[in-house]
Amino acid sequence: MSKDKFLLHEEFKNPLNKAEFLEAKKLYLEFITKNEYEIKATKDIFQLIQNIKRSPEKIGPYQIMSVFEALNRIGSDLVLLSGAEKLFTSEIPPEKILLRMGNTQGFDFEVFYKGDKVIYGEAFNAAESFCKHKMRQAIDKLVDKNPDEKATSAIIFINEEMKGILEKYKNKKEKQSQMVIHTIYCKTN
């Protein structure tokens, strides 16, 4: 995400330890709670589409992008923040985590453990109608494009509303792979 569109680029550009993460998360959430953007009321559906999907705005930590795009990124970012916090408070917390906020390419996050062990992960915040498709994409990417050919595990962060739908979901690629994919369901509010 370019720094001209994501206002917290500097805070998230490097792997963060727990203290750095908590500070960056606090700052991110301040951008959300102090947001001044308001959806412009209109009964004209064509104008509403223009306002939401086309007009560049500043919303939360994003600027110069449509409200639609910014809200999609914020939704995924909230999953990333919640998932990272769960990892930092887990039984085996990582040393650092690199979060790619508003990511559009590469892996969404990397988890760094002692001994140079890196676990790659994907994150998404999806609606019920799209969650299995997003899960399939995430699994395929983690299995097929993992830069560590010897990787035995990966992580997927998902908005917790999809737990009932995805709890028992396994796709063909995951079943055939030697990789264990850990799913972490995340609060987004």
Q: Which sequence ranges carry the predicted segments?
A:
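C-terminal tail/extension regions appended to the core domain(s) of diverse proteins
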Residues: 1-10, 175-189
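Nuclease-adjacent, charged terminal/linker segments that flank catalytic cores
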Residues: 1-55
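Hydrophobic, Leu/Ile/Phe/Ala-enriched alpha-helical segments that form helix-helix packing faces
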Residues: 28, 32-35, 83-91, 142-146, ...
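Acidic-basic catalytic patches of nuclease active cores, encompassing PD-(D/E)XK
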Residues: 53-100
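Short beta-strand or tight-loop elements
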Residues: 105-107
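Conserved catalytic cores of phosphodiester-cleaving nucleases, focusing on short active-site segments
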Residues: 109-129
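Catalytic cores of nucleic-acid endonucleases
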Residues: 123-178
